[in-house]
């Protein structure tokens, strides 16, 4: 009977300890906000208060498109030489495959 009472007491103390730890974890992240802050004051001085007043988001069509892209590099040939037909054929075949 004493063993059951000891187990219940340990479980009770463990539950209280976990509950206290969980409630303390949220206190440090809370901010005190005052409603008398004017965002126009910051904007007039060249300061962007991003954190409190929200971020400006880009339109969905403005961002980079997903998918692999291959950037073609333009390398000048020395002496004004023309590229060989074989090289042009390989480059054309690579572009057609993509």
UniProtKB/Swiss-Prot annotation:
Alphabetic keyword roster: Amidation, Cleavage on pair of basic residues, Hormone, Secreted, Signal
GO CC list: extracellular region
Disulfide bonds: none
Keyword Secreted listed: yes
Main localization (coarse): secreted
Compartment(s) of residence: Secreted
Phenylalanine amide modifications at: 53
Residue positions assigned to the propeptide: 58-98
Signal peptide stretch: 1-22
Entry's Gene Ontology molecular function annotations: neuropeptide hormone activity; prolactin-releasing peptide receptor binding
Tissue: More abundantly expressed in the brainstem than the hypothalamus.
A single GO BP: autonomic nervous system development
Described function: Stimulates prolactin (PRL) release and regulates the expression of prolactin through its receptor GPR10. May stimulate lactotrophs directly to secrete PRL.
PANTHER family recorded: PROLACTIN-RELEASING PEPTIDE
Protein name: Prolactin-releasing peptide
Species: Ovis aries
High-level lineage: Eukaryota, Metazoa, Chordata, Craniata, Vertebrata
